[in-house]
C-alpha cells in the first residue's frame, strides 16, 4: 500500500509533532507499506523519511526541480521523482497514493490535502483521507472562546 503523507519541511513548534511523525514512519516501514512524500531532507519531512527507512520500508519522494536545484532532496531515499513544478508534484503524489494523511503544516500542506479531499468528494478518487489534527491546529475556536 502506498501512503501519501503531507507535512512541512520545518520542525514545527510542538515536540509531539516530531514524535507522532516518527511513530507513523516506523509503522509504515514495519507494515510493508511504501511512503510517498515531498522528498525533502529537512524538518518533519526528513524525520518521516528517515524513520520509514530505519524500519525497513521504502520511500518515494516527489520533488520539483527547483527544490533539487536548492539541494533540499533526501538522497538516501528509495526513489526520487523529479517534477517540473508544484502542480505536477501534487498530481504525481495523488496518482501514487492509496491513502492520504496530512499532519499539521503550513498553507502548502493544507492546499495538498484539500485537493485530495475535493477529488474524493467529487468521486474522482476513492481513497481514505486523514486530516491528523494533532495539536488542534485545524480546530477553530468556538464563538464562546473568542
What are these regions (language model features)?
Residues 119-127:
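Arginine/glycine-rich "motif VI" loop of SF2 helicases in the C-terminal RecA-like domain
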Residues 44-103:
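Acidic/glycine-enriched connector segments
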Residues 36-39, 60-64, 129-133:
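Short internal beta-strands
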Residues 35-36, 97-109:
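A short, small-residue-rich loop immediately preceding and capping a beta-strand
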